[in-house]
Amino acid sequence: MASLRKTHPLIKIANGALVDLPAPSNISSWWNFGSLLGLCLITQILTGLFLAMHYTSDISTAFSSVMHICRDVNYGWLIRNMHANGASFFFICIYMHVARGLYYGSYLYKETWNIGVVLLLLVMMTAFVGYVLPWGQMSFWGATVITNLLSAVPYMGDMLVQWIWGGFSVDNATLTRFFAFHFLLPFIVAAMTILHLLFLHETGSNNPIGLNSDADKISFHPYFTYKDLLGFAVMLLALTMLALFSPNLLGDPENFTPANPLVTPPHIKPEWYFLFAYAILRSIPNKLGVVLALLFSILVLMVVPMLHTSKQRGLTFRPITQFLFWTLVADMIILTWIGGMPVEHPFIIIGQIASVLYFALFLILMPLAGWLENKTLKLA
């Protein structure tokens, strides 16, 4: 008689995804980041739930309620630090996961990839509205600057901004609705994650050499369950070390000052994980261009599968495109650095060059390199 895990209507779904799932035998640690993202999401939802029990979404008490959590609630300081730094780890894992997808050609699973890009946008939205909640100076001014970009939408821009604000400026109504969105969005992310996995399990995982691995599959459990558990241990250790030893390392000191609409901070900037997009945004002098560049800096990922020209899937045996991939990584680091710098020479021109290179790599240089590599293969 077949075991319960193979016959029970609910358990057999989990069994198919976590126990008997056929997985390529040669997938490296770069394939760990998917499960790490699941762990990050669960950690963020749990810590966020406990924070929401003590937080008040009113401009007169929001800042002091966060201070109250850190000072008076049992282990509130730990929950808050884990949640704030957990967001940083979430984005580290996302960027690693996307980089793995780009390097090994996982984007050729188009449905899985496109749902992943939507997931990235949703997580970015969640992080943005979450950053507003402590109601510090950078929370307030960050919300003001970014929401104001919608005024560039033709005809209905100003109306759209006031609709999102719930008034004529970022105020109590804005904070209340941002809290509602920040509570709701992670559950939408969780639902989309299930869809992401559903489409992934239609095709199975890609692997480092980019060839069909049907002839050499192993079961997910115990091989990859234990491999994932090791990843969990490493990430949780790193997260707790950051949250316990230097919890404010990645934050902005400006956010320890309560929001004041009458005093503008000398340098408005988002959290480190948005700095690359912020640098692209700032490199364009036109407001509508800024909105389009900001959106396209992420949506360009959706175009990648359409621009795949190479006969090979991954970059394992493609040195020219490998060089371009690492150029992209370096470019992202430069953009992140520029996003945190003041708007003055030479940072303006460096940001503009890095922004042009960012889009050129995706839209022109990588497709050209793939075509060139096909030609060199014919000569060999």
UniProtKB/Swiss-Prot annotation:
It comes from the Eukaryota. The chain crosses the membrane at residues 33-53, 77-98, 113-133, 178-198, 226-246, 288-308, 320-340, 347-367. GO terms for cellular component: mitochondrial inner membrane; respiratory chain complex III. It is a multi-pass membrane protein. Binds 2 heme b groups non-covalently. Keywords: Electron transport, Heme, Iron, Membrane, Metal-binding, Mitochondrion, Mitochondrion inner membrane, Respiratory chain, Transmembrane, Transmembrane helix, Transport, Ubiquinone. This is Cytochrome b. It comes from Pethia conchonius. The gene is mt-cyb.
